[in-house]
């Protein structure tokens, strides 16, 4: 595993995408990012004290792209378990790509594919302070515990946990992984709104299905939301 460290960079994920000699588990770490982003191209505002990192994952030829659509969920439970190894707090997984603590976002995940690699980008609020409107919707590990952490220790713990969960995934243990995810399903039983092109549907979130879709119960029917096809909001 090669490690690339930066005090500042545009994006750790973009750095890895630009590399010509990509290798499995190449890891890029930055203190700050100037052009970090989340799903749908949303800007990801970075601060010093965050864990900002991305790594490469070589595509396994015998795993279908449909199976790999579950990778954000596998990454999510890996981050959650990694954080729980550091502090035994009640972390939750919010479908499809966030970790929550005390009803606030503490981590965002972005999984992208380039050629025969996945680029997995992760941003975790660790030692950074949060003020203003951001403090109403996000939190950091230090805010919950009052402690300071060695950021790279957090990164390597999360990466170690990812390798364990990914090995389980490759060994056919997806149903067991999914059960763990659903036990930490932040949206379950919450009223949410699915938002598409010129339409909205309100419903109650249920479990995450075996294919990675989120169950939604509306007044008329039970439906399933696909990863990446819609976005959602909730009260």
What name fits each language-model region?
Residues 24, 63-91, 101-235:
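Long, positively charged amphipathic alpha-helical accessory segments at protein N-termini or as interdomain linkers
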Residues 1-85, 146-150:
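N-terminal lobe of the biotin/lipoate ligase/transferase fold
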């Amino acid at each position: 595993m090669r490690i690339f460290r930066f005090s500042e960079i545009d994006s750790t994920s973009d750095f890895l995408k630009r590399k010509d000699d990509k290798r499995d588990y190449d890891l890029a770490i930055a203190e700050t990012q100037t052009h970090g982003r989340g799903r749908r191209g949303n800007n990801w505002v970075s601060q010093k004290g965050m864990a900002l990192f991305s790594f490469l994952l070589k595509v396994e030829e015998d795993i279908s792209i449909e199976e790999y659509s579950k990778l954000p969920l596998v990454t999510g439970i890996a981050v959650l378990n990694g954080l729980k190894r550091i502090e035994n707090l009640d972390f939750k997984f919010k479908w499809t790509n966030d970790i929550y603590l005390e009803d606030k976002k503490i981590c965002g995940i972005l999984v992208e594919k380039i050629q025969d690699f996945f680029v997995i980008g992760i941003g975790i609020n660790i030692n950074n302070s949060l003020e203003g409107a951001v403090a109403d919707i996000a939190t950091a590990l230090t805010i919950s515990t009052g402690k300071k952490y060695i950021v790279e220790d957090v990164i390597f713990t999360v990466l170690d946990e990812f390798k364990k969960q990914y090995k389980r995934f490759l060994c056919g243990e997806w149903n067991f992984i999914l059960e763990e995810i659903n036990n930490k399903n932040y949206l379950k039983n919450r009223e949410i709104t699915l938002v598409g092109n010129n339409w909205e549907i309100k419903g109650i979130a249920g479990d995450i299905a075996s294919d990675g879709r989120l169950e939604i119960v509306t007044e008329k029917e039970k439906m399933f939301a696909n990863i990446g096809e819609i976005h959602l909001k909730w009260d």
